[in-house]
A protein has these predicted regions:
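Extended terminal accessory/targeting regions
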Residues: 1-145
Length: 145
């Protein structure tokens, strides 16, 4: 079963909109109980990138905050053409199909959804947030993203 292994420790940056991860935290990948993905100390996030007009319904932080930070890290990896190996604690424990392969935006979005389910974010919220990231990705990068 997927789960986060560590607490999330952050500090607010001077701009008041971004946060720095103070301690590396990890997430067990769904398909392999030994495979851990990491968000490194020093990573900068904005939590959930929700337009301000919707903050009363879905604020940038909430039960899904760790999921949003993991998603941000995977999206940065996608944009920088990083391999799954780069976000794994131990690349040899990754499923073979992910080893030495670039992260796809679709996979980052799927893990966002999976991680929200793992920490029991309610189904409606999961669907709304997942739909939002998919629509954004399709408009920004096309259907192959």
């Amino acid at each position: 079963m997927s789960k986060f292994r560590d607490p999330l420790h952050v500090k607010v940056l001077d701009d008041g909109k971004h946060y720095e991860v103070l301690q590396t935290f990890t997430y067990y990948l769904y398909s392999n109980k030994e495979a851990l993905l990491k968000v490194e100390q020093g990573f900068i996030t904005d939590f959930a990138s929700v337009p301000r007009v919707f903050w009363s319904i879905y604020p940038p932080f909430g039960r899904y905050t760790k999921c949003a930070v993991l998603h941000d890290r995977l999206c940065v990896a996608f944009l920088n053409k990083e391999l799954w190996n780069d976000v794994a604690v131990d690349k040899d424990k990754l499923p073979v199909v992910l080893q030495n392969r670039f992260i796809r935006r679709y996979e980052a979005d799927q893990l966002f959804l999976e991680s929200m389910k793992a920490i029991k974010v309610n189904a409606f919220t999961r669907c709304v947030l997942y739909a939002c990231v998919r629509v954004y990705a399709i408009f920004k990068y096309g259907f192959k993203a």
